[in-house]
């Protein structure tokens, strides 16, 4: 039997790292705080309805394929490409915009508001393509042992991209497009990083390339939780045990080595190597008691937005509503600048709606739909009181009904609401921040919490708040980077 590994947390990065380790001869055990694995990539079942609780689509499918090849398995889930990627609706217009990967089809919708949209979009995406290919292998998919190493890596990036470092996402988009509609829709992807186009670095315009040209977006057959279910099946075949309802609260270690973690009941969990898949910053503070990651120090870091999520089962079909939909207001700039810190933005919220049952009939009873709403909101520093959750949720649901021309309120069969309070409690997210640490320039690469521990040589980290960052493909990459660290130790 190989060296033993304890993985704390059964999020996507934890599951992926565990499988890599098991396939390379390690004896792996996973402990998970919650009642089922998956972390934020989870599932809610209620009254005959099934909901994805977190991510509702994914990109960079080749990272998942490479992971499966590395582990010597077939990809343990099936997926389909989204076309259109999603729709966008503005409150001051009845028009629905369809975001297609086919640039000609996309451009046809902009003829009246953005002359030469196709040519502009191709120039913009070509720049995004060059940023992506000049940075992803050098910066995103590498471990760094020091700031010096990180600096050397950055020096390998084509210097033509240097001006990008001094622009925001919206500023880069505005260099190519003049209409409000084009600017807003092209920059919408910045919200996927948990911030806004006005405070996200222009470096991340590379995401436009990943969505429109490089790979696109995908839905998992049966729902996104199928990724977790597939990995759990493979872990079971590999002899990996998952123990749920086990929250780690303390540790024991000496002479630069971690000896055991302790759970809330006092039981110790020992191993040769340890991997923490909780938030890398929060875990260091709450479990490892590191002063550099105290609540006060964490508050000084930059975090992603909080999220209000609504899981709604209704007694009617919505044939004219797409799988993925964004509903925006007519005050995009003002809203985006205020949404992180001003609770008043919830009076006219922007939100996303996923109709999971659109292509997964089993996720809702016959004649019904399963709807998943996501609304960006201030985190608990700026809105600690969520006693108005019901009022806010119903205002969003009512607005959605008006936008689609169908009052769905009388058809509600089940409704579940998660606020940043629930996200903080269930997943140990700082102040209810939905995606962990933000991706500002001084919080990426070697500036991000390391994926190896500062004190214990046999403790490592994987997940959103360590390298490379948030998102499902990033979790797969994070698992591999942690795996490389761990296998180099022994």
Question: What annotation goes with each model-predicted range?
Answer:
Residues 464-486:
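A conserved FAD-binding loop/helix module that cradles the flavin
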Residues 315-424:
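C-terminal segments that line or cap access tunnels to active or ligand-binding sites in enzymes
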Residues 185, 189-214, 218, 456-457:
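Active-site-adjacent "gating/activation" loops or surface patches in catalytic cores
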Residues 206-251, 255-258:
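Helical element adjacent to the flavin cofactor pocket in flavoenzyme catalytic cores
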């Amino acid at each position: 039997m190989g060296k033993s590994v304890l993985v704390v947390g059964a999020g996507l990065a934890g599951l992926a790292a565990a499988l890599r380790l098991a396939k390379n001869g390690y004896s792996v055990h996973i402990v998970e705080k919650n009642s089922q694995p998956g972390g934020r990539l989870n599932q809610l079942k209620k009254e005959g309805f099934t909901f994805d609780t977190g991510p509702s689509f994914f990109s960079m499918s080749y990272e998942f394929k490479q992971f499966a090849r590395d582990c010597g398995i077939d990809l343990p889930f099936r997926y389909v490409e989204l076309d259109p990627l999603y729709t966008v609706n503005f409150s001051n217009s009845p028009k629905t915009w369809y975001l297609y990967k086919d640039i000609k089809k996309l451009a046809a919708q902009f003829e009246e508001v953005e002359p030469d949209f196709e040519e502009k979009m191709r120039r913009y995406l070509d720049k995004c393509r060059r940023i992506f290919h000049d940075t992803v292998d050098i910066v995103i998919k590498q471990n760094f042992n020091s700031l010096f190493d990180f600096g050397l890596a950055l020096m390998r990036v084509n210097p033509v991209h240097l001006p990008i470092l001094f622009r925001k996402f919206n500023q880069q988009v505005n260099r190519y497009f003049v209409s409000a509609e084009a600017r807003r829709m092209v920059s919408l992807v910045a919200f996927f990083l948990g911030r806004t186009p006005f405070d996200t670095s222009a470096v991340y315009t590379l995401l436009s390339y990943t969505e429109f040209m490089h790979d696109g977006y995908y839905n998992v057959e049966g729902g996104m939780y199928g990724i977790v279910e597939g990995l759990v099946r493979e872990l079971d075949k590999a002899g990996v045990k998952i123990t749920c309802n086990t929250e780690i609260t303390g540790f024991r270690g000496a002479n630069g080595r971690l000896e055991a973690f302790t759970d809330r009941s006092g039981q110790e969990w020992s191993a040769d190597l340890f991997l923490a898949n909780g938030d890398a910053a929060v875990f260091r503070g709450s479990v490892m008691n590191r002063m550099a990651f105290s609540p006060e120090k964490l508050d000084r870091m930059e975090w992603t937005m909080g999220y209000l999520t609504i899981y709604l089962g209704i007694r009617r079909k919505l044939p004219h509503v797409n799988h993925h939909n964004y509903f925006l207001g007519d005050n995009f700039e003002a809203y985006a600048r205020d949404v992180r810190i001003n609770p008043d933005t919830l009076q006219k919220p922007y939100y996303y709606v996923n109709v999971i049952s659109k292509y997964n009939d089993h996720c809702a009873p016959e004649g019904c739909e399963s709807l998943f709403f996501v609304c960006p909101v201030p985190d608990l520093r700026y809105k600690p009181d969520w006693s108005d959750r019901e009022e806010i949720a119903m205002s969003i649901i009512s607005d959605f009904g008006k936008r689609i021309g169908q009052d769905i309120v009388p058809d509600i069969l089940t409704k579940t609401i998660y606020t940043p309070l629930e996200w903080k409690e269930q997943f140990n997210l700082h102040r209810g921040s939905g995606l962990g640490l933000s991706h500002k320039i001084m919080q990426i690469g070697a500036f991000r919490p390391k994926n190896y521990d500062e004190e214990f040589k046999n403790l490592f980290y994987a997940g959103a708040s360590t390298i490379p960052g948030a998102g499902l493909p990033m979790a797969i990459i994070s698992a591999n980077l942690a795996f490389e660290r761990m296998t180099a130790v022994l």
